[in-house]
Design a protein with these regions (language model features):
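Active-site recognition of the HExxH zinc-binding catalytic motif
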Residues: 129, 140-161, 165, 192-193
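Cytosolic-facing loops and C-terminal tails of multi-pass membrane proteins
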Residues: 220, 224-280
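Short helix/loop segments within enzyme catalytic domains
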Residues: 85-87, 179-240
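Post-HEXXH active-site segment of zinc metalloproteases
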Residues: 156-181, 185
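Active-site scaffold of zinc-dependent metalloenzymes
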Residues: 113-139
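Short amphipathic alpha-helical coupling elements at transmembrane boundaries
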Residues: 135, 144-147, 151, 194-198, ...
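Hydrophobic or amphipathic, alpha-helical segments that drive membrane association/targeting
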Residues: 1-107, 252, 270-280
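Short gly/ser/thr-rich secondary-structure transition/capping motifs
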Residues: 108-112
């Protein structure tokens, strides 16, 4: 539901912007486009300078979105190249063979003493674990971490979280998108924990692994991973996850940002009023 809202709203806005840009640049006659109606109404009111600003907003939104996505993709490719150079091929092959039954997930085990566990990549995501983490965890904890990350990989969470964060950054006039992006990350981590609990049969493995990773991780390691497209085992909503692991029956209540919802709803309401007024 959160992804549907966070992706559906900006998709609708982008479609409207595309239709409006085609009308302004190439003369497409699209009379049911909300931005065209805004332009038509402003022309009747003599506010064409606002119409030019609206076209500039459309072009900046498309250019900014394309630029941000390109930057994220370049950063991820650079990160993957770095990880491949640090890969311990023996460990990687061992894990790929051990968990081959899980719809063939791709494991990359890097030679690093610090514990690392995350899923990275847009189009071909893979699970990255460090030798330090594998030495630190017992078999039950390792299995729980793997199932957690496999859940992210199956559901392409790095791609989805990236899209939501880019849309939220490029459409600040719809503030509910920022909230949706943040809450989506929390929900996905909780669902990944649930996957691990269901697969292992209890919450001991995932809870113990999370606590070990939090104690061992230094701030520099976490900070160095914030710019690449990944879903990390220990970076998101830690307090909520620990509370729920201690009390699995406890419901997680998502906070509704009333101010952001009000602002976002007002934007759509104003567009609707312009639509009705213009065709009336």
């Amino acid at each position: 539901m959160l992804f549907t809202v966070g992706f559906g709203i900006p998709l609708l806005v982008l479609v409207q912007m595309f239709m409006y840009a085609m009308y302004k640049l190439f003369g497409w006659d699209i009379r049911l486009n909300l931005l065209w109606l805004c332009n038509h109404w402003m022309s009747r009111m003599g506010w064409m300078s606002v119409g030019h600003f609206l076209l500039l907003l459309v072009l900046l939104t498309f250019a900014g979105t394309s630029w941000l996505l390109s930057v994220r993709m370049i950063q991820t490719r650079a990160a993957m190249a770095k990880l491949r150079s640090m890969e311990n091929h023996i460990w990687s092959e061992r894990l790929n063979a051990r968990y081959e039954h899980l719809r063939r997930p791709r494991f990359v085990v890097v030679e690093q003493s610090s514990p690392v566990a995350f899923t990275i990549g847009l189009w071909r995501p893979c699970i990255v674990l460090s030798t330090g983490l594998l030495h630190m965890l017992d078999p039950e904890e390792e299995e729980a971490v793997v199932y957690h990350e496999v859940h992210h990989l199956w559901h392409r969470d790095p791609l989805k979280t990236t899209l939501l964060s880019v849309f939220a950054a490029m459409m600040p006039y719809i503030p509910v998108l920022k909230h949706t992006s943040q809450q989506y990350r929390i929900v996905r981590e909780i669902l990944a924990d649930n996957e691990a609990i269901e697969r292992t049969g209890n919450a001991v493995g995932i809870g113990s692994a999370l606590l070990k990773l939090l104690r061992a991780c230094s701030p520099s390691i976490v900070e160095s991973r914030t710019q690449i497209i990944q879903s990390s085992f220990a970076d998101t909503s830690v307090n909520v996850r620990i509370s729920r692991l201690l009390d699995p029956e406890r419901d997680v209540k998502l906070r509704l940002p009333r101010y952001a919802i009000l602002i976002s709803a007002t934007v759509f309401l104003l567009l609707s009023i312009l639509f009705v007024w213009s065709i009336g």
